[in-house]
């Protein structure tokens, strides 16, 4: 039985962890995840999905604010683990820790070398990729730069957003890891170096990147909106107030970018630099998320054709 330390944080990671727990070839000695955080307006302390899964399985849990140089790292190195599996952990692993293991692999939610970084699923959508995927790679000190052990792809559809793709890729990552790990541990797989000429980066989304620029095409804005749904959520401004857009569809239309072209009982069409967007799910300032019909029947009922979204 191979003894593992698992490191991860969000639901994606929890799915991978639960997969490992179903396989009796592995023993999880410890789980490392990010500390509990205060979430929302009420600052409710929330455990990570990985911590919740680990508690359900009765596993030892470590939550260092920073792994490097921590007492927790020293404890982990004394457990006698054969290797480390990480999946969206959110911290760099110190070389000292990596060097103490027989192996360390990462489950990364992109088709490396494309989309290294913390937001690969977001960027796959924002940049209009036709496919997404998961790469199992060896851990090195440089971010997502290790040799690739295996990859698996799935198509991206127009119905996908961050939430749906997150769920799909979590299952892909779980299955790919379970399919790959035995042969890798046995030495039957020769990892492949990444082509550095093809590297792209997908860093965490910055607040200023959430803002919609109506001078882009309808397809670009469509991709940005779904590439931020359900988080962090793209926004624009309407009458000076922040206006979030969760869902929209590209449609035909022509007008000044940001201009309202037509209003119906269940339809609000806004011009872009090329074509237009039909808004489907929105959140006006100070209001809950709602479908476009509810918006137009409520706070949006005073809107008129020709008004503008934007600054």
UniProtKB/Swiss-Prot annotation:
Family annotation (Pfam families): Formyl_trans_C (PF02911), Formyl_trans_N (PF00551)
Entry binding sites for (6S)-5,6,7,8-tetrahydrofolate: 110-113
Main EC class the enzyme belongs to: transferase
GO molecular function: methionyl-tRNA formyltransferase activity
Keywords from the UniProt entry: Protein biosynthesis, Transferase
CDD domains assigned to the protein according to its UniProt record, in alphabetical order: FMT_core_Met-tRNA-FMT_N, Met_tRNA_FMT_C
Gene Ontology cellular-component terms listed: cytosol
EC number: 2.1.2.9
Catalytic activity: L-methionyl-tRNA(fMet) + (6R)-10-formyltetrahydrofolate = N-formyl-L-methionyl-tRNA(fMet) + (6S)-5,6,7,8-tetrahydrofolate + H(+)
Stated role: Attaches a formyl group to the free amino group of methionyl-tRNA(fMet). The formyl group appears to play a dual role in the initiator identity of N-formylmethionyl-tRNA by promoting its recognition by IF2 and preventing the misappropriation of this tRNA by the elongation apparatus.
Record family assignment: Belongs to the Fmt family.
Protein name: Methionyl-tRNA formyltransferase
Organism: Streptococcus pneumoniae (strain P1031)
